[in-house]
A protein has these predicted regions:
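Short acidic low-complexity segments
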Residues: 30-41
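Cysteine-nucleophile active-site neighborhood
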Residues: 51-120
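Short acidic/histidine-rich motifs immediately flanking catalytic phosphotransfer sites
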Residues: 39-49
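Structural alpha-helical scaffold elements that stabilize or flank donor/cofactor-binding regions
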Residues: 38-39, 68, 168
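Extreme N-terminal starter segment of soluble prokaryotic enzymes
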Residues: 3-7, 173
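N-terminal beta1-alpha1 ligand-phosphate binding loop
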Residues: 6-28, 182-183
Length: 189
């Protein structure tokens, strides 16, 4: 099943094995790699991420993966920090990110709610987007983050935590979700 082959880009974060396990469990054959040729020949790409934007960008740079990611033509999904890396800039360490779509990542403004934003929250998406096919409007997904991307023209879904923020973004073949699909049960699948 070539369709079910998933290539996870090794961003050097700690939780890669749990992401791989979750996708294996969904019936994908997931492989974690930092090999440029494997990434280029991949069927579907996953850009995971936990930790800081600065550390992740440094890891990608050291592995010469930045151009490889920017030039990818196959569908790529960024999760959590992986989604944040897809925009132009992160104020977390003031680091230029991959620039795959507009927007920047900022600390969630203090509205008296605890950070990180952690737990289940409702997601409202733009109707008709294939990423949310078969998912009910205002479904709940699992979030853990302190930084967020303000809604902009790349936003295809929002959630609210003291303010509206982008729960999902998309541009061409690049997709990002702020929530953790691998921890969101049936809707995450």
């Amino acid at each position: 099943h070539i369709m079910n082959k998933l290539t996870i880009i090794d961003t050097g974060c700690a939780n890669l094995s749990s992401v791989k396990f979750a996708f294996d469990h969904l019936g994908y054959r997931a492989e974690i790699t930092r090999d440029i040729h494997k990434i280029q020949s991949a069927n579907k790409l996953l850009l995971p991420g936990v930790g800081t934007a600065m550390a992740a960008m440094r890891n990608l740079q050291e592995r010469n993966l930045i151009d490889c990611i920017r030039n990818a033509t196959q569908p790529m999904l960024g999760i959590c920090l992986g989604m944040q890396l897809m925009t132009e800039f992160s104020t977390e360490g003031n680091v230029a990110t991959l620039g795959l779509m507009n927007g920047q990542t900022d600390l969630i403004p203090n509205s008296g709610l605890p950070l990180p934003h952690m737990g289940w929250n409702k997601v409202r998406y733009t109707p008709g987007h294939p990423l949310f096919a078969g998912i009910e409007q205002d479904s709940h997904f699992y979030f853990v983050h302190s930084y967020a991307i303000q809604p902009n023209e790349s936003t295809i879904a929002t959630s609210c935590y003291g303010m509206d923020f982008s729960a999902a973004i998309a541009n061409k073949n690049f997709y990002g979700v702020q929530f953790h699909p691998e921890r969101s049960g049936k809707n995450g699948a």
